[in-house]
Amino acid sequence: MASIHPTAIIEPGAKIGKDVVIEPYVVIKATVTLCDNVVVKSYAYIDGNTTIGKGTTIWPSAMIGNKPQDLKYQGEKTYVTIGENCEIREFAIITSSTFEGTTVSIGNNCLIMPWAHVAHNCTIGNNVVLSNHAQLAGHVQVGDYAILGGMVGVHQFVRIGAHAMVGALSGIRRDVPPYTIGSGNPYQLAGINKVGLQRRQVPFATRLALIKAFKKIYRADGCFFESLEETLEEYGDIPEVKNFIEFCQSPSKRGIERSIDKQALEEESADKEGVLIES
């Protein structure tokens, strides 16, 4: 049975699932759906054609499903979908989409920290972390298990690959390949996200292949896309390397980030890589 505080405003038509908890002074508009076991804490505001998945918690003063911050929006019917077991923390803003029938989508088990902003037409995968004040412009795509540090700014239409780790205060203008780590404004790649992949129990051989593939691609003197093809021939039997290369080869409105932190790469010898990965 749902628990709804008497000061909460629930418009007629809103769909409230089993065992939902709605705290004081929450506003839930008529076209919102809260699935089972959702918790909405005080002063949160949920609007639009928004669906919140099972077990997700919306923290105080978060705002979800509002009109997109896009002058092209003319009142079209658009959507927000948030998956299961997410944490949408204090003052986070997730706006609705812009074009008719389109959706802002957030996957399962995501953590959206305070003051983070997810703009119109964004797509976020599963197990993603947006740290405090991370800001996604419109049409950004974030892959599974990606982590964005505090106060990261992401340009519209950028893609951030799965398992990427973006350091705090970074400015992202181009697509960030999966499995990589980097930071800075302007952004620079610093190699493969070895620690993150190890924590997710990616096999040693796969991690080592990703490291070698990254260096082969980014240290090449010739054409970047020729290096991708050569690396695909050498390591293409490893799914993660194939994913990395296909991400870089796929259509992009912003282009692939090619700037690297040369010092960070030079500090890694082959022996050191092995020790870091296996430890």
UniProtKB/Swiss-Prot annotation:
Tell me where in or outside the cell this protein is found. Cytoplasm
Q: Which UniProt keywords apply?
A: Acyltransferase, Cytoplasm, Lipid A biosynthesis, Lipid biosynthesis, Lipid metabolism, Repeat, Transferase
Look up the EC number in the record and give it.
2.3.1.129
Q: Which domain of life is it from?
A: Bacteria
Q: Which CDD domains match?
A: LbH_UDP-GlcNAc_AT
- EC main group: transferase
Taking the first listed entry, what is the main subcellular location of this protein, grouped into a coarse class?
cytoplasm
Molecular function (GO) terms for this protein are:
acyl-[acyl-carrier-protein]-UDP-N-acetylglucosamine O-acyltransferase activity
* Substrates-to-products reaction catalysed: a (3R)-hydroxyacyl-[ACP] + UDP-N-acetyl-alpha-D-glucosamine = a UDP-3-O-[(3R)-3-hydroxyacyl]-N-acetyl-alpha-D-glucosamine + holo-[ACP]
Enumerate the HAMAP family for this protein: LpxA
Q: What does this protein do?
A: Involved in the biosynthesis of lipid A, a phosphorylated glycolipid that anchors the lipopolysaccharide to the outer membrane of the cell.
Subunit annotation: Homotrimer.
The entry's protein name is Acyl-[acyl-carrier-protein]--UDP-N-acetylglucosamine O-acyltransferase
- Name the species this protein comes from: Chlamydia pneumoniae (Chlamydophila pneumoniae)
